[in-house]
């Protein structure tokens, strides 16, 4: 009886140790921020501001807001670990011949950042998203 009790105790301890060592899959940034709904809100807010901006608004004339929002959501979703697959034009193709200046690019970034704050993202989440989006600058500025 004592042997069985010892075996059960050892077995329980080993089971607990093995369970503690098992790693659960890390939550994606996409899921952490609230997924598609949050991205849709962020870009909806940012686009409203961008389209009326006196410096960069002219770049978006003729581009339907919903189309732009959908493309930005898809692209960001894919970059931050969501289930989406961006299938739009390449950034180089979409921005060629626009002569976007670095200053203009950062105006857009500020609107997106502001929208992230407005929906309640933490600075850490905001910075992690911006880090994923940062390479886009080199595909859009001065092309």
Predicted feature residues:
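Globin-like tetrapyrrole-binding proteins
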Residues: 22-143
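C-terminal motif of bacterial Sec signal peptides marking the signal peptidase cleavage site
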Residues: 17-20
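Bacterial N-terminal signal peptides that target proteins for export
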Residues: 1-10
């Amino acid at each position: 009886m004592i042997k069985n009790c010892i075996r059960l105790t050892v077995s329980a301890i080993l089971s607990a140790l093995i369970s503690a060592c098992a790693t659960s899959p890390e939550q994606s940034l996409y899921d952490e921020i609230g997924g598609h709904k949050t991205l849709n809100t962020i870009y909806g807010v940012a686009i409203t501001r961008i389209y009326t901006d006196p410096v960069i608004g002219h770049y978006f004339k003729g581009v339907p807001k919903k189309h732009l929002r959908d493309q930005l959501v898809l692209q960001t979703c894919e970059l931050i670990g969501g289930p989406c697959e961006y299938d739009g034009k390449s950034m180089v193709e979409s921005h060629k011949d626009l002569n976007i200046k670095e200053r203009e690019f950062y105006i857009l970034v500020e609107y997106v950042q502001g929208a992230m704050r407005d929906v309640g993202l933490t600075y850490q989440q905001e910075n992690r998203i911006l880090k994923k989006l940062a390479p886009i600058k080199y595909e859009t500025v001065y092309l």
